[in-house]
Amino acid sequence: MSSLADTIHIENVVASSDLGQELALDQLATDLDGAEYNPEDFPGVVYRLQEPKSATLIFRSGKVVCTGAKSVDAVHDALEIVFDDLRELGIDVDSTPPVKVQNIVSSASLEQSLNLNAIAIGLGLEQIEYEPEQFPGLVYRLDDPDVVVLLFGSGKLVITGAAESADAQHALAHVNDRLTELGLLE
């Protein structure tokens, strides 16, 4: 059996930055090759990169949000490409704008089926939500790390709200330890 940590895969990293200036989005969408701007549908320019695969949302306020990257390094690389492209258009972008990772979404597996009804009872109602008629997963809110773990009957997990990659490992270890303590894992 592999280490549980080996089952963790980052699915999405969301990071933000601020250019510290207002942007003319109509002009930006025209000048930025491949950018999409439909203000009736969404208030920002959507700028997609193929490598690293990501989408960057650029707002009039100068705020920038990058999503879709599969690693923290990739989100930083994507934003650096976006910043370089903006500089090429004559937009004054700091040499190293601050980038803040907002959310890392990971998937993982406990490598066995789970009895979500028993888990809901064992963990108690204070930290969980489980309404299988509305959603097939059990929602487990952790305080440390401050993440939300979705547990599914298949043993698969989704960990969201992480600020750094290690949070997913800590969350997976916590869930595994807690379910083992409760006698709910083989």
From Swiss-Prot:
Write down the InterPro entries for this protein, in alphabetical order.
Answer: TBP, TBP_archaea, TBP_CS, TBP_dom_sf
Q: Which GO terms describe its biological process?
A: DNA-templated transcription initiation
- Provide this UniProt record's keywords sorted from A to Z: DNA-binding, Plasmid, Repeat, Transcription, Transcription regulation
Q: Cross-referenced CDD domains, in alphabetical order?
A: TBP_archaea
The UniProt record lists the keyword Transcription regulation: yes
**SUPFAM superfamilies to which the protein is assigned, alphabetical:** TATA-box binding protein-like
Q: Where are the sequence repeats?
A: 10-86, 101-179
Entry keyword annotation includes Transcription = yes
Classification via Gene3D superfamilies: TATA-Binding Protein
| GO function term, MF aspect, one | DNA binding
Q: Which NCBIfam families match?
A: PRK00394.1-2, PRK00394.1-5, PRK00394.2-2
**Purpose of the protein:** General factor that plays a role in the activation of archaeal genes transcribed by RNA polymerase. Binds specifically to the TATA box promoter element which lies close to the position of transcription initiation.
- Sorted alphabetically, which HAMAP family does this protein's record hold? TATA_bind_prot_arch
Query: Into which family does the record put it?
Result: Belongs to the TBP family.
**Designated name of the protein:** TATA-box-binding protein F
Q: Which organism is it from?
A: Halobacterium salinarum (strain ATCC 700922 / JCM 11081 / NRC-1)
Instruction: Identify the coding gene.
Output: tbpF
